[in-house]
Amino acid sequence: SGTIKILNNSIDFSLKSQNDKLRAKKIGIIYQDNNLLNDFTVIENVYLARLSLEENKEKAILDAKKLIKKLGLSNRENHLSSELSGGEMQRVAIARALINSPDIILADEPTGSLDMKNAKEVFKILLKLKNKNRLIIFATHNRFFANMADCKIELISGKIRKSTNARIR
């Protein structure tokens, strides 16, 4: 709980229903264990994340298809998410996080359950997003990926051990 300010909008996380739409529009979340709906298809997993904000189902589906294509999953859009590989599932999770065009993406160990090949693919996607003027905040235990960050904050037992200043690349 608490309050954060994003682009001159305050979001009070203790007022759940009042801020759900604003939070969904401004913040995309990528969970460590992807949080997909196993009995739903790839396309359903993505467009359902939009329906809370978009009443036009056809537009939500069209936008979801565009994202799925950008992430290289067009040939899997009608497969159940439970039929996907770990890397594919994480790309679907990224598409869900992006469907509302958020300004900020929070990623909790986005590569934690992936092999190195798929983990690098996911980070390539995240770096492309960063270059499109989105703020990406991610948690990782992997130093290789941590070193890709413009700014790092190292935590031990919930306390800041050290931090680095942001650098422009």
State the predicted function of each range:
Residues I105-D108:
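Catalytic Walker B motif of ABC-type/P-loop ATPase nucleotide-binding domains
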Residues F40-L48:
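Short coil-to-helix segment of the ABC ATPase nucleotide-binding domain corresponding to the Q-loop/switch region
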Residues I11-G28, N131:
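ABC ATPase NBD coupling module
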Residues I94:
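Hydrophobic anchor residue at the start of the ABC signature
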Residues G2-F13:
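Conserved ABC transporter NBD signature motif
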Residues A24, H79, N100, K132:
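Conserved signature/switch motifs of ABC ATPase nucleotide-binding domains
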Residues L80-L84, E88-Q90:
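Conserved ABC ATPase signature
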